[in-house]
Amino acid sequence: MGFTDKQEALVNSSWESFKQNPGNSVLFYTIILEKAPAAKGMFSFLKDSAGVQDSPKLQSHAEKVFGMVRDSAAQLRATGGVVLGDATLGAIHIQKGVVDPHFAVVKEALLKTIKEVSGDKWSEELNTAWEVAYDALATAIKKAMV
């Protein structure tokens, strides 16, 4: 079974909720650094800070990550696969030293953030929709890293 209209709608609605509160981006990166403190140096907007502090660059990057997962959901529903819109993503991830375990950390942070953002609208179905979309995006990025 492919990615459904309902799954795409779940991702879209929670994406909209995510964007409404800038604190969600801080939460996302806080979770990442709790799991992988060494990853701090991979993010230019965190490298020289004492901790995770809100900034336009942090907001922009978080929205880009969540937005790409949302776009992946749309692609999965429409075509059954994900094609990167930015051909440089693989090279950027290589340059930053991203390795396979980092994708798992980001996935966990993304899913925890979405759960927090969704509040009483959270469900296993919502979680699965984000998980499937993220996994497809991560696979596409990893392929581009070769």
UniProtKB/Swiss-Prot annotation:
GO terms for molecular function: heme binding; metal ion binding; oxygen binding; oxygen carrier activity. Heme b binds at S44, K64, H93, K96. The modification Phosphoserine is found at S44. The keyword Transport applies. InterPro entries: Globin, Globin-like_sf, Globin/Proto, Leghaemoglobin-like, Leghaemoglobin_Fe_BS. The modification Nitrated tyrosine is found at Y29, Y134. Residues 2-146 form the Globin domain. Belongs to the plant globin family. Monomer. Leghemoglobin that reversibly binds oxygen O(2) through a pentacoordinated heme iron. In root nodules, facilitates the diffusion of oxygen to the bacteroids while preventing the bacterial nitrogenase from being inactivated by buffering dioxygen, nitric oxide and carbon monoxide, and promoting the formation of reactive oxygen species (ROS, e.g. H(2)O(2)). This role is essential for symbiotic nitrogen fixation (SNF). This is Leghemoglobin-3. It comes from Medicago sativa (Alfalfa). The lineage of its organism: Eukaryota, Viridiplantae, Streptophyta, Embryophyta, Tracheophyta.
